[in-house]
Structure formats: C-alpha cells, structure tokens
C-alpha cells in the first residue's frame, strides 16, 4: 500500500523511484538498449497496447492491470533518441477518503446534482484520486448513470447503486471532445472528464453543466 501512487522512471540512468517527492535510484545506469527492452516488455504485458503507437507519435499514455497485484498507469516517450517511461502504481481497491485525509467538506461535493466541479493542482497532487473518491461516493449512495471519460483509465468502478460507464480515450473513443459530445446523448446524470484539455472540450463541459448535468474535471495548476 505504501507504494501506491509512487512512480518508477525508466530512462538512460539507474532505475529511479519517486516516493513522497524523493528520488531513489537503484542499480546501475541503464543503456538505451536496456530501456527499449524494458519498455517492449511493458507493452507485451499490457497486451492490448502496441509499441507502434509510441514509435509513430513519440509518446503514449495507457494503463493495464496485473491480477492480484494492481493497475499501472504508464507514460512512454522518446527522449534524446532513446525510449523512456514513467510508471505509476494504482491500487485495485478504490481509496478511502478518510485514509487520504480528504476533508468531509470536499466529499460533500458528491451531493451536488448539477453544475461543474473542478479539482485543481500540480501533477501528482491527488486530483485523480480525489475524483475517484467522489465518483465512488455517488456510485454507493445514488441511483445515477455515471460516465467517466479518461486518458487513460485509472481507478475501475463496479456498478453499485449507480451504473458506471468508463471510456478510455484512444481505445474506446477518439478524443475527449468526441466522447464528451456523445455522452450528452447517453442519458448521463454525472460526467467525469479526466482533464480540461482544450477550448472546445471546456465549452462542451460547461454546456453539459448548464443543462442540468453534474460534471467533474481537473485543471493543472502550480
């Protein structure tokens, strides 16, 4: 549990773990052929993802699960002619707001029925985890249709009182914009938009909130 949310960095230096904002280096420096082999192995484990996406675009972002271990969010990219990756461990079990010290006032946002709720902060500050807690609170207490649009999917929600439809950009839909526009025709009560990424997506999200839906999303801030 202590490693959940921590990150492992693979590039042309020793394997580096980022835990509680501290960098811990392990082993000898990796050569470019070592990083390529490790990243190729990650794509083999992920199965549904192909390394050709990385080679074509120069970067890729996806998640996958290993039974009895956990889910992993992976960002692969090319830098200085070699391959690199950042891997984050995500627990199968959804986080407990009390264990994460999320204030009760924040959790009360799950009681809203319409409007736009933004969770802001820097990378790694817990935006996605906070949203997962809010979505799970609604899932456990209300009969709603919840649609999540994420890139990639992180926490997986099981149907409880609500029905939860989870869509991943690139594997389930072309883009946030396309998925968000389509979601308005899918009878949603609650929409989770992983990130306010561009003007048109923001505009559609605001329209959804103004027309009676409850929309959750994130913004990167310093």
Regions flagged by a language model, labelled:
Residues 2-10:
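Short, small-residue-biased leader/transition segments that mark boundaries at the very start
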